[in-house]
Amino acid sequence: GGSDVSAFLAKVDKRAVGGEALARLLIVYPWTQRYFSTFGNLGSADAISHNSKVLAHGQRVLDSIEEGLKHPZBLKAYYAKLSERHSGELHVDPANFYRLGNVLITVMARHFHEEFTPELQCALHSSFCAVGEALAKGYH
């Protein structure tokens, strides 16, 4: 459940995991790079994986998810401004929120091996989907 997710996220190195996840999103789904045109060199997988702006934004995303999940009954309100920014200003395809959630799960499984049980994966998936829905709210 939610408390398991919170306890797990508290242990996660946000820069390492968030940064790797955002880098992988940009590599695996290269069309997402258009949202990060101000981030400098995204010319290769290696450049993306070592780009300090990508790593910092990945950390910011994971910090935001951890903080947002402390407001489960109020997620849409918590993410209202961020949702408007991603929809109105940045025109991010909301499907990318779900893609990033899936990539985060992949990276977390890589980092946490045995501790990353199917039950934890299920709880994280539900949590990331809820965050994705809250962020997609600005699109309706």
From Swiss-Prot:
Heterotetramer of either two alpha-B chains or two alpha-C chains and two beta chains. Pfam families: Globin (PF00042). One of its GO terms (cellular component) is hemoglobin complex. Keywords: Heme, Iron, Metal-binding, Oxygen transport, Transport. InterPro entries: Globin, Globin-like_sf, Globin/Proto, Hemoglobin_b, Hemoglobin_oxygen_transport. The keyword Iron applies. This is Hemoglobin subunit beta. It comes from the Eukaryota. Heme b binds at H57, H86.
